[in-house]
Amino acid sequence: MLTLSGWITTQVPPSSRAAADAKAARTGTAEQAEDPAAGTDAADQHVQLSQAGRELAATMGVPVEEEDEDIPQELRPMVKMIRELKKKIEEKLRELQEAMRSSDPGAKEARVPELQKELQQLNSALQTATAAMASAIKEMGISDPALIMKVMGSR
């Protein structure tokens, strides 16, 4: 098992263990976690990653949109969440408008309050996320007005 920075763990297949051990010996970046002579699993290794490596690992599998490259890594998940909440709010507003135009009064009476409640919850979540974003921006000491507008506007 390979543990990176204490937060990423992956199983190393037996065929790649020798190559991983050889590379670790060459680079000196891995330490044997347990002694193979003691009868324990020799594939357990601990790897120290640089800051750049941690940032790269954090973005693995999550494509960064080109216009978001200047947004600090720590803020990207919040920006994404705010965008998703805004998108859901727009969808619910469209549903609410359709429900209000409904010719069936029974369906209208049932659906409109339900959609209004969902909109309240989404708006509350958006307010919470926006407050968390503002707090994170302040904590990080970001003062670039264009970046703040981009992050807070989140499209």
Swiss-Prot record:
Q: Region labeled Disordered — which residues?
A: 1-44
Where does the source fall among the domains of life? Bacteria
Biased amino acid composition, Polar residues: 1-14
Residue spans with biased composition (Low complexity)?
17-30
Q: What is this protein called?
A: Uncharacterized protein PA1545
Q: Which organism is it from?
A: Pseudomonas aeruginosa (strain ATCC 15692 / DSM 22644 / CIP 104116 / JCM 14847 / LMG 12228 / 1C / PRS 101 / PAO1)
